[in-house]
Amino acid sequence: SELTMRQTLANAFGDRDFWLLTVGFLACGFQLAFIGTHMPAYLADNGLSPSVATTALGLIALTNIAGTYLFGVWGTRWLRKTLTVWIYLGRAAAILMLLWLPLSSWTVYAFAAVMGFLWLGTVPLTNGMIGQIFGMRYVSTLFGFVFLSHQVGSFLGVWLGGWLFDAYKSYTWVWILAAALSLLSAVLHAPIRERRAPVAAAAAA
């Protein structure tokens, strides 16, 4: 039989993999909120027109549709943690390439297309891992706790992005921090064990 909500929450809160998912998801929120809020100002500071920023955000939204769908499908075929690791590595690479390459409308569009494809692919994969590890009955409840970390990251991405810009008159350190968090999240997801959800009899034993 299935576990009760109390048993499921107790299992999750005492499980290393739940906390790896939770802490790792903070990086996702940081990156998405920082880019969505501060990228237009970053591009303007580097002499690019507002139309480049709006086009880039539109590209992110467009390619996100394909990325979210495909990562959801791929998560039924391959290990979700492995796909999630590749998402975070891809984001880090895209951010570092944006900083390294000469900034132009075309490099911005390329960055936006790649980042958009990787934008919300973490969501179906994270939900899938929670469901597989802890069972589907309370997956929404558990994802809510994990998503809280994402929203903390979102707050930090917006607030810290502005604070660091005011302190250093540049967004460079925020971009570097976003890439570093992405690499850290990849490391955190790598040891997650995707396994069958426990049942009440096993828990009682």
State each model region's role.
Residues 18, 80, 136-140:
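Cytoplasm-facing, short amphipathic helices at loop-to-helix transitions on the intracellular side
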Residues 34, 52, 58-64, 68-71, ...:
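C-terminal transmembrane helical hairpin of 12-TM major facilitator-type secondary transporters
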Residues 50-51, 136-146:
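Loop-to-transmembrane helix entry/capping segments in MFS-fold secondary transporters
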